[in-house]
Swiss-Prot record:
Organism: Colwellia psychrerythraea (strain 34H / ATCC BAA-681) (Vibrio psychroerythus)
Keyword Oxidoreductase among UniProt keywords: yes
Full protein name: NAD-dependent malic enzyme
Gene name tied to this protein: maeA
One example GO MF annotation: oxaloacetate decarboxylase activity
Binding site for NAD(+): 154, 267, 415
Enzyme class label: oxidoreductase
SMART domains listed in its UniProt record: malic, Malic_M
One Gene Ontology cellular component annotation held by this UniProt entry: cytosol
One BP term from GO: malate metabolic process
Amino acid sequence: MPQSQRPLYIPYAGPSLLETPLLNKGSAFSKEERGSFNLTGLLPPRFESIDEQAERAFRQYSCFQTNINKHIYLRAIHDNNETLFFKLVQNNLAEMMPIIYTPTVGDACEQFSDIYRSSRGLFISYEDRFNIDDMLRNATKNKVKVIVVTDGERILGLGDQGIGGMGIPIGKLSLYTACGGISPAHTLPVMLDVGTNNQKLLDDPMYMGARHKRIDQDSYDEFLELFISAVKRRWPNVLLQFEDFAQPNAMPLLQRYKDRICCFNDDIQGTASVTVGTLLAACRSKGSKLSELNVAFVGAGSAGCGIAEQIISQMMNEGLGAEQARSQVFMVDRFGLLTQGMGELRDFQQKLVQSNEAIAEWDIAGEFASLVEVMHGAKPDILIGVSGQAGLFTEKVITAMKSHCEMPIIFPLSNPSRQVEATPSQVINWTQGQVIIATGSPFDPIEYQGKTFPIAQCNNSYIFPGVGLAVVAANISRITDGMLQVASETLAAASPLANGESDELLPPLTSIAQLSRDIAFAIAKVAYKQGLALELTDDELLAKIEHNFWKPEYRQYRRTSL
């Protein structure tokens, strides 16, 4: 009997059952269940299916005029009836993904203390650092398989949001379930509250987080060690995703813990994987290889450098040597092109500097090459923005790029949409429509000279749900670069544009559940070859993936005593 058809034995009854979001069915409780669970009279008399409930919920949702109010409404359903919430989201994924995650989740993080209704997940403050084991035991979910954790310091392109950063793990895990089939019973959002340096929040009487500046680095490192160790004791096989940690901590945390626990940083590795997958699709659509092209970045933080390193790995997979691959990648930060001799660079940036000899023939006015000078000197075929600064891709920059590249690939990826380096409309106009474009935030299609340009959203949700599904289905113990590379390849293989099926660079969101299955399968195969997963035949692996792919369906309940 399929798991969804097996009855669940439930110890709760009456209001306690209705107040348990993972179990509440609302008006869908049958007559027999209402009698068995002391629900008679607590609900309207009509029995409804989940489809009828979802139709009513969508009508209510549609009455809200602003995205933030739609977000608040969906969170209310999430906190009341998780099965209905995910049914509603899956039925309307393209409409609701920008509401439950980027860009609207950015507004929700900024307004967290103002719109707070009820608790979800764990809030672990530095002051409680010696009680973390007890706090993890307080979690209402015993079989946690995926944790998303943040410290709220670098939320999207919005900076330090303190405790408001909790909106990101909640939203991210919603997509693990909606897109990757991870059961909501197995997910846990965690906020590590180490204070905030956002004075506006500290001065806000409604702010719900710890009212002090962020703790010093030694205290921070001690706190993270206590947290990771406690998680390993409680759930030794969990997948831990680091989310929206600031640059000074993001890469060091990943390097410190990647061999101690199954973990990854979505801002670094997930962003890199989806970007490389989208680039591969773009390259194939124009009949070229990534290794044949030059790439320029605006933004040399942990995310940008993470993408660059995966691009270099892909170029090497295509036959280039490491030195040649690195010579084709140009990183621009706020001071200019990363170059030998530039001061105050982090270790991960040092590996991506250009030699002084390589740019000796360039026409450079200042100490370091500007973005426009990089366009003329490097002649990049690809331009990627991960700066978090709006407007950096000016008309002068784009026209300089277009002067040497017939069909440039331009990805302004910064989130939220108000932080984007250039809008799709601007890029299309400045290139006379001769461009392949993808963005980090959702944008409507652009009409230009009688042609419609669909705008691909280079969204990490194409990748991380499949990573989670692979870990859960195949008991993967570590995440490796090879797994993320095969995820990129799987995404590229699904590109309608590269396959000549349509003008869409990335597959539609309606197919993301199947894409997550395909990515999970590919990752699990690599994991087994690397000795990091179960040994399974292809048929066994497919069955495992399907068995673990949760669907928002009500199950029959039977009562048991506590």
